[in-house]
From Swiss-Prot:
UniProt-listed Gene3D superfamilies: 3.40.50.880
Xref: PANTHER family: IMIDAZOLE GLYCEROL PHOSPHATE SYNTHASE SUBUNIT HISH
Subcellular location: Cytoplasm
Reaction it catalyzes: 5-[(5-phospho-1-deoxy-D-ribulos-1-ylimino)methylamino]-1-(5-phospho-beta-D-ribosyl)imidazole-4-carboxamide + L-glutamine = D-erythro-1-(imidazol-4-yl)glycerol 3-phosphate + 5-amino-1-(5-phospho-beta-D-ribosyl)imidazole-4-carboxamide + L-glutamate + H(+); L-glutamine + H2O = L-glutamate + NH4(+)
Organism: Dehalococcoides mccartyi (strain CBDB1)
Record GO terms (molecular function): glutaminase activity; imidazoleglycerol-phosphate synthase activity; lyase activity
Active site: C79, H181, E183
Main location, first listed in the record: cytoplasm
Quaternary data: Heterodimer of HisH and HisF.
Record's protein name: Imidazole glycerol phosphate synthase subunit HisH
Task performed by this protein: IGPS catalyzes the conversion of PRFAR and glutamine to IGP, AICAR and glutamate. The HisH subunit catalyzes the hydrolysis of glutamine to glutamate and ammonia as part of the synthesis of IGP and AICAR. The resulting ammonia molecule is channeled to the active site of HisF.
Length: 205
């Protein structure tokens, strides 16, 4: 079962459409027990990190997400969903996040248009099944003003250049996190979802 986390925010409709387009079934849920019984979990995100963290904590989902990472249940976190996995963010002053991944979320540098809104290149830093059928340098769709800076550089799966060469994708065991929106990134975005589901579920749908 695929669980799509509903914490009162996030890009649920677009993500749901992407899952359906690939022929998979999912459950939209805010129930921690249901999330921890899933075979794969998607944590979407749009808007402010502080609001996302507050929404997760209000429903007890922060602890559920920490636990599923401990249990090595496959997790795909998107955009702000990725950012809140880290220790803290500069957004809104200094906001404490979930602390699942060591590192800080920083504002994009002065000198570039903020937010970054549009297509940009993904430079693959590792060979991984997540990238199967996706050429290095493929463009994906971004909407963000902040980026994650992991303390452990070994978890950086891909980078993107926008005033700074930033981490745009994390691979840490079965935790995948993207700064870009795969569900808004056309056929290659769907391919990334498909690769994630294949890693998590095998050939089941």
């Amino acid at each position: 079962m695929i669980a799509l986390v509903d914490y009162g925010g996030g890009n649920l409709k677009s993500v749901a459409n992407a899952i359906h387009a690939l022929g998979y079934e999912f459950t939209l849920t805010s129930d921690p027990k249901e999330i921890l019984s899933a075979q794969a979990v998607i944590l979407p995100g749009v808007g402010a990190a502080a609001d996302t963290v507050a929404g997760l904590r209000a429903k007890g989902l922060d602890e559920a997400i920490k636990e599923l990472v401990k249990r090595d249940i496959p997790l795909l976190a998107i955009c702000v969903g990725m950012q809140v996995l880290f220790d803290s963010t500069e957004e809104g002053g200094q906001t404490k996040c979930l602390g699942i991944l060591a590192g800080e979320v920083k504002r994009l540098p002065d000198g570039v248009k903020i937010p970054q809104m549009g297509w940009n290149q993904l430079k693959q830093r590792v060979s991984h099944p997540l990238f199967e059928g996706i050429p290095d340098g493929t463009d994906f769709y971004f909407v963000h003003s902040y980026y994650a800076s992991p303390a452990d550089r070994n978890i950086i799966g891909a980078t993107t250049d926008y005033g700074v060469d930033f981490c745009s994708l994390v691979i840490n065991k079965r935790l995948i996190a993207t700064q870009f929106h795969p569900e808004k990134s056309g056929s290659y975005g769907l391919k990334l979802y498909q690769n994630f589901f294949k890693m998590a579920l095998g050939d089941k749908k």
